[in-house]
Amino acid sequence: MTKKVIRKPDSLHDVFERKGGSAPTATHYCAGCGHGILHKLIGEAMDELGIQERAVMISPVGCAVFAYYYFDCGNVQVAHGRAPAVGTGISRAEDDAVVILYQGDGDLASIGLNETIQAANRGEKLAVFFVNNTVYGMTGGQMAPTTLVGEVTVTCPTGRDPRYAGYPLHMCELLDNLQAPVFIERVSLADPKRIRRARRAIKRALEIQRDGKGYAFVEVLSPCPTNLRQDAEGAERFLKEEMEKEFPVKNFRDRSAETEPLIRSESDFSRESLDRIFQIREDSVPDPVDDPEFPEVRVKIAGFGGQGVLSMGLTLAQAACSEGRHTSWYPAYGPEQRGGTSSCGVVISGERVGSPAVDTPDVLVALNQPSLDEFADDVADGGIILYDSTTASFSGGAVRAMGVPALEIARKHGTARAANTVMLGVMMALGLTGLDEESFREAIKFTFAGKEKIIDMNLRILEAGAEWARENIEGEL
């Protein structure tokens, strides 16, 4: 014999301690508001499906922003319109989570419209409950994207005029044009019969999430008697005779039976996988050895994207690592593949590196004029600037500056793209980093491993740069 039990669902708190105030068992919603009904329907479905421990409720700005007062599950409050973005992140990071977006029309259909469409188009694993009461409820009843033509609100006191404000936005119809959504339905809370139908749709949307099948969207036509100045009968009549006429209550799509669970590949950030991807070998990067006698050297390399700025820094860092020095490499570059500003900082130290950022370099390598102009004043007292005199000029300053015809030397030895290697050779010959010359040569081999012709050419250019430095600069330091 079945026993009838009248109580709140387990997925809703019995006492709303988070809400506080003098009425801890009452919600903050107005009398006659549809949110309370919808909360119960969602809570009951969560209980029946056994998903309470997996559920994460996302509540953005609006009347339901305090949903975490009531739902006994994971809860995240988000900025206005950003529920789909946050929900996507949670769903993808926690693949087993049942992610529920609870949004109003002033949120989902306005500031959050683009993110809603994009999430639906991607078929994200989200159950979206869209509360349509035709107004911005929380802020006093202003016109919303779903406000009916002719409907009076605080911000359209003579009624919505489509000549100025357009027409009500039909979200179900809009999303039904997309391929990815699994389930789309519009329901109403106008009377008990309609509420029972709404209950079935809500449960189906959550079933789809339980089974990991993809995107489910339920639009809920809901009363807002306070802002629309309606009594109970007026609210019911408005839903049935006006809202349902504009927004037909029906199922637009249910592909759950033929849809397979959405299985995404698992991320693997293990050290072994990362080492394999980046071709890092234990024997190529020995553990650093503390050597307080070795002075810290901070190098900044700058130029255009495509000049080998970052690879020069990596090669220098590899040379330092091979000698067991504490080393960091820190890149900074724009979005352009070629031509944009690019720089990197390399710190070589006998002790643990405190910060990889090189704000006051001991050595500045500038491969073009803009980089020389931008960073020359940052060089530390006693530091040195190496710049490509083929493309830049320096009028002098408080630090030593040496013009190196790097581009000219590189062209002479086979390729203009190796001006960065010329600069490495100059640094090697001048001993600016305290590293052995052989470490530079081995670093070149490591950087271009498997490309023997490129290795041979860069080794020749490295030596050419070093030879030029010995003949033209070495005696000046």
Curated annotation (Swiss-Prot):
EC number of this enzyme: 1.2.7.7
GO molecular function: 3-methyl-2-oxobutanoate dehydrogenase (ferredoxin) activity; thiamine pyrophosphate binding
InterPro entries in alphabetical order: 2-oxoacid:Fd_oxidoreductase, Pyrv/ketoisovalerate_OxRed_cat, Pyrv_flavodox_OxRed_cen, THDP-binding, TPP_enzyme_TPP-bd
Matches recorded under Pfam families: POR, TPP_enzyme_C
Keywords: Oxidoreductase
Catalyzed reaction equations: 3-methyl-2-oxobutanoate + 2 oxidized [2Fe-2S]-[ferredoxin] + CoA = 2-methylpropanoyl-CoA + 2 reduced [2Fe-2S]-[ferredoxin] + CO2 + H(+)
GO BP terms in the entry: organic acid metabolic process; sulfur compound biosynthetic process
Subunit (UniProt): Heterotrimer of the VorA, VorB and VorC subunits.
Protein name as annotated: Ketoisovalerate oxidoreductase subunit VorA
